[in-house]
């Protein structure tokens, strides 16, 4: 499956406000990046959502700064634990809270990192490269970081950028 997405740094939205939005959901995510060939990103994820836990393995090959070919499958907890021993050297498990909501029929994902107090990362998938992203009025975009390697999840597992440089 080809995924086209855009990524932005935003001011952290008011938690109570976004919880009241249509189709809001919240999940705790732990991502671990694994050793792989250089053109491939290989990760496993533990996602806690509504009293359940789902484990997935994802292999992603970047096509360009906006799109990637992605293969994802659900795995067992045992497989997750076994694969986690192959963590890529120089990386750390990445923890974040993901809040999702729908606005004008479009799914928005806001990733909140414990290391940042005032900002978060917003991602949205697009149907095409030229699709224009319409933000809700309560989202304040600081800057777009689509294609900026410092803000890829794989890079953030090595070093989360200082919020002051945002």
What are these regions (language model features)?
Residues 1-166:
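Phosphate-end processing signature that detects enzymes handling 5′-triphosphorylated RNA
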């Amino acid at each position: 499956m080809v995924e086209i997405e855009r990524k932005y740094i935003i001011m952290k939205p008011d938690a109570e406000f976004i919880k009241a939005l249509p189709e809001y959901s919240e999940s705790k995510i732990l991502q671990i990046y694994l050793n792989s060939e250089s053109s491939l990103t290989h990760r496993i994820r533990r996602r806690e959502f509504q009293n359940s836990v789902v484990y997935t393995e994802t292999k992603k090959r970047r096509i360009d700064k906006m799109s990637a070919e992605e293969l994802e499958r659900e795995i067992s907890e045992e497989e997750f634990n076994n694969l986690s021993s192959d963590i890529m050297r120089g990386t750390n498990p990445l923890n974040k809270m993901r809040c999702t909501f729908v606005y004008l029929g479009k799914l928005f994902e806001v990733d909140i990192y414990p290391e940042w107090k005032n900002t978060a990362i917003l991602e949205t998938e697009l149907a095409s490269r030229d699709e224009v992203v319409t933000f809700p009025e309560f989202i304040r975009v600081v800057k777009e970081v689509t294609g900026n390697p410092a803000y890829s999840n794989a890079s953030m597992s090595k070093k989360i950028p200082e919020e002051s440089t945002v």
